[in-house]
A protein has these predicted regions:
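Active-site mouth loops of central-metabolism enzymes
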Residues: 53, 84-97
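Active-site-proximal helices and loops of the catalytic beta/alpha 8
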Residues: 3, 19, 101-206
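Core domains of carbohydrate- and sulfate-ester-processing enzymes
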Residues: 2-79, 199-206
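Solvent-exposed, acidic/flexible segments
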Residues: 43-46, 92, 96, 128
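Low-complexity, polar-biased intrinsically disordered regions enriched in Pro/Ser/Thr/Gly
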Residues: 81-88, 143-149
Length: 206
């Protein structure tokens, strides 16, 4: 029995009965919606047959909060809610803006000093830049709020972002513009070099 498997651990088993609830066509690029999902640049591509969030353009049309999230957020959960994110559970903005605000809320709430971003090339540089801007502002808010409470609040290092770009090799002059347009401070390449040398290349644009 599926439920008993969890209960024997013991783990509370809870099920979502609203199987027809989903992000919706405004949020998700998905072949099932009759849209093309295979852009050559990888930005509007359903990687590994997974739906893709429509976050390529931060200035895209505003979207509303999906119904399943509205239902979830109707019941306050003070033990797990992030207060800094509550103001972004309403209204409308582009998908990229919602995502950037939600992620930056963790920075504002917990004083996170940087992000390591995975599979960077599948999200536009403009959207990454937006995340960098929101996170930088969020960290400044956290530091101002926590002076005298946390030693890190007195740090002056800017918010740091490093990105993983498969088969990137290196780009010391930032010709790819991941630094200038994407807001990244460094990049790492997890491509496996067949020669067995330089397996990981870490470059800092400056």
């Amino acid at each position: 029995d599926f439920g008993q498997t969890f209960h024997d651990k013991p783990i509370d088993a809870r099920y979502d009965s609203s199987w027809n609830r989903w992000w919706g066509k405004d949020w998700i690029l998905f072949d099932g919606y009759g849209e093309s999902c295979g852009a050559e640049d990888g930005l509007d591509k359903c990687l590994a047959y997974l739906p893709d969030l429509k976050n390529t353009d931060p200035n895209a049309k505003p979207v509303n909060i999906p119904e399943f999230l509205k239902d979830k957020w109707k019941s306050p959960d003070k033990d797990h809610d992030i207060p800094a994110a509550l103001k972004y559970r309403q209204g409308s903005m582009s998908v990229a803006q919602f995502e950037a605000h939600w992620l930056a809320s963790w920075v504002e709430e917990f004083g996170i000093d940087g992000f390591r971003c995975d599979t960077v090339k599948y999200v536009s540089k403009d959207s990454w830049k937006l995340l960098k801007e929101y996170s930088t502002e969020a960290l400044e808010h956290w530091r101002a709020k926590n002076k005298g409470k946390d030693p890190a609040a007195s740090w002056t290092d800017p918010f740091y972002m490093t990105g993983e770009v498969w088969a990137f090799t290196n780009d010391p002059n930032d010709k790819s513009e991941y630094a200038k347009k994407g807001g990244f401070d460094s990049l790492i390449d997890f491509y496996f070099n067949p020669d067995g040398v330089n397996l990981n290349t870490c470059i800092t644009p400056d």
